[in-house]
Amino acid sequence: MNIRLLVVSKTDIPYIQEGIDVYAKRLKHYVNFDLEVIPALKDQKGASPDEIKEREAALILKRLEGADRIVLLDEHGKEHTSVGFSGYLQKQMNAGVRNLVFVVGGAFGFAPSVYAAAHDKISLSQMTFNHQMVRLFFVEQLYRAFTILHHEPYHNE
């Protein structure tokens, strides 16, 4: 399976990027993993949050393919425990999903067109996180899920 994390705008906080790099490297042991960054929009002055979401949506949708299984990281999505999330990944693999794409939107979230294209929504917490921090939290949880699936000692119950 190929897993891609599609994010809007680069991670500009160095310690967050370092953490992402650590877990992305570890993930390569288990799965083909790629982090794809959609460059930040230019000239957003005066644009409403809805206009920004629509512009970002066009960029997100352009990078998705028909065979992709699209999962939004969204505050209104289904919450999983770490073990539950590993089970979710196992179900995707058992179903023969080849390309699993997780999407982190910009600061204002997603436009309706992105919601319409998605197959699932997952929430990392009922709390709201900075969209850059979500990247690190998610990549770590992805790594944790694969260690659970491989019965490795990283995760403690």
Q: What are these model-predicted stretches?
A:
Residues N32, P39-R98:
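S-adenosyl-L-methionine/SAH cofactor-binding core of RNA-modifying enzymes
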Residues M1-L27:
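N-terminal beta1-alpha1 ligand-phosphate binding loop
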Residues N2, R98-F102:
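Loop/turn-to-beta-strand initiation segments
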Residues L6, D34-E36:
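General small-molecule cofactor/ligand-binding pocket signal
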Residues T11, E75-K78, G106-F108:
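Short glycine-rich anion-binding loops that position phosphate/pyrophosphate groups of nucleotides
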Residues G105-G106, A117:
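Proline/glycine-rich low-complexity loops and linkers
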Residues L5, V71, G105, F138:
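Conserved RecA-like P-loop NTPase ATPase core
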Residues P112-N156:
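Structured adenosyl-cofactor binding patch, chiefly the S-adenosyl-L-methionine
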